[in-house]
Regions:
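Hydrophobic beta-strand positions in extracellular immunoglobulin-like domains
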Residues: 143-147, 162, 191, 205, ...
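Intrinsically disordered, low-complexity Pro/Gly/Ser/Thr-rich segments with frequent PxxP/GP/PP motifs
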Residues: 156, 165-196, 205-206
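Short, acidic/polar linear motifs in exposed loop/turn regions
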Residues: 147-152, 209, 376-377
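Terminal connector regions
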Residues: 193-236
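Short aromatic-acidic-glycine turn motif
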Residues: 161-173, 210-211, 391-401
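Beta-strand/loop-rich accessory regions of lumenal/periplasmic or secreted enzymes
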Residues: 190-196, 227-440
Length: 440
């Protein structure tokens, strides 16, 4: 085996090492500090592991940080499209034979230095302080100061907001208190948390004094803590749900291919061949303009460059749902419909084995339970979900959840819970190379 002599180097370094690879080095050797030459590749909707690497760096004294690749997308402006947006050209767009395609489009900002959501994620991961603990009964709040030289009271001022179901119900400014660099400090923040609803306490870190590049009060980051009590149902959402007569009887009729469920204010149809809804009419409005689908496909991100060929080989992009058996059980207060189905594609074996259970109440409420088992021979799924094709007139969105920008299971540090309004088009993140985006 070829070996290398590292004796003249003061540190050990790797490009894009997995966390397990870093831990293995720290456990087995660790004689030199570990430097991440490049990490968190920021291509398109890509940098989803900032928090994991931050924790690794902070938890190990032998980790000396690293360099995110990279700052900006590199592309050339080529005029504007019909919609008024700038056209950006990259590798291959000028007729050259040898090029790297869009591999130069891997930054935290767009070519015009507009911020990517990845930079927002990066910013909040590296906020100056973090909540260690909060006792909502006593009000004791413990913070850790991540600054190397500044006492927290000299660098930031901290405001807070208490929200219930996304609406701010109280706010204020914390009194100054000392937290030494890389130390912990305590203060008291006593708040009155409502007995019900989804409640969150948000601490916002503001720059205390103007710096050469930053204004006073510039937001440096935030922490969010759930402080809900036992009743966590979103009361605001309950108010949105139209009031219906709950004791009205259901009419359930079925034939060889369809199940029709009708109540006083709604009419639903389920296709027995797919076990999914083809019609959802409620309070006089039809919501679906295309049958519902189980979905495992999405537009590949740039960081899917290697696995996307496996996805295509598995025909994930051509998958559809097929139901085999359906059982209908009608009770006093509703109907339960259970189907055995699968997600399949032509020329390949069954991808997913699926059990779908719909419980429909007399008032029209639908509870769904979808249990899925994947064939281990297939690669990891791009995603799994239910697609509902709504009338295009339903373009205004109001939701309680994480926002305002897109967020994912591994990319949500910059998002917080709130009540958000937007047009459907505004939820789109316009990556220069079209790809998965806009998860809210």
């Amino acid at each position: 085996d070829e070996t290398y002599d590292y004796s003249n180097l003061d540190m050990y370094s790797r490009m894009y090492p997995a966390l397990s690879e870093i831990q293995e080095y720290l456990d087995k050797d660790g004689s030199k500090p570990f430097l991440l030459v490049e990490y968190c590749h920021s291509m398109g909707n890509g940098p989803g592991d900032f928090e994991d690497y931050f924790q690794m760096i902070q938890d190990n004294d032998k980790m000396c940080g690293g360099f995110v690749w990279e700052w900006c997308d590199h592309a050339i402006a080529h005029g504007t499209a019909e919609n008024g947006k700038t056209i950006y050209a990259y590798g291959g767009d000028h007729g050259e034979e040898i090029h790297d395609g869009n591999f130069c489009m891997d930054g935290l900002v767009y070519p015009d230095r507009t911020v990517h959501t990845g930079l927002l994620e990066y910013k909040n991961v590296y906020r100056p302080a973090r909540v260690i603990s909060y006792d909502k009964e006593s009000g004791e709040l413990v913070l850790h100061n991540y600054m190397d030289f500044d006492d927290l009271k000299d660098y930031v001022k901290i405001s807070y907001e208490l929200t219930q179901d996304g609406l701010v119900i109280s706010k204020g400014i914390l009194p100054e208190f000392s937290v030494a660099p890389h130390g912990e400090g305590k203060t008291n923040l006593k708040i009155n948390v409502p007995e019900n609803g989804k409640c969150y306490l948000k601490l916002i870190y503001h720059l205390k004094k103007e710096l050469p590049l930053l204004d006073e009060d510039h937001i440096l980051g935030f922490d969010e803590i759930e402080v809900s009590k036992e009743d966590t149902k979103c009361k605001l959402a309950e108010k949105w749900i139209p009031k219906t007569v709950v004791d009205s009887e259901l009419q359930v009729n079925e034939n060889d291919t369809q199940i029709h469920i009708k109540g006083r204010e709604f009419a639903y149809t389920i296709d027995k061949r797919t076990a999914l809804f083809t019609e959802m009419k409620f309070a006089g409005r039809e919501y679906l303009n295309h049958p519902m689908e189980l979905n495992i496909w999405r537009a590949p991100t740039d960081n899917d460059m290697y696995i996307k060929s496996e996805w295509k080989k598995a025909h994930y992009d051509k998958a559809y749902t097929r139901a085999y058996t359906t059982e209908v059980v009608q009770g006093k207060h509703g109907v339960k419909i259970t189907s055995h189905a699968s997600v399949v594609a032509e020329t390949v074996q069954k991808i997913l084995d699926v059990t779908i259970t719909w419980k429909i109440e007399a008032a029209g409420k639908i509870d769904a339970d979808i249990a899925v088992t994947k064939d281990d021979e297939f690669p990891d799924l791009p995603r799994f979900g239910v697609r509902m094709f709504l009338d295009k007139k339903l373009s205004a969105v109001r939701y309680f959840g994480m926002g305002p920008q897109e967020s994912y299971c591994d990319k949500h540090q910059a998002a917080s819970h709130g009540l958000y309004r937007a047009d459907v088009g505004d939820l789109h993140e316009d990556y220069i190379r079209p790809q998965e985006n806009g998860s809210h």
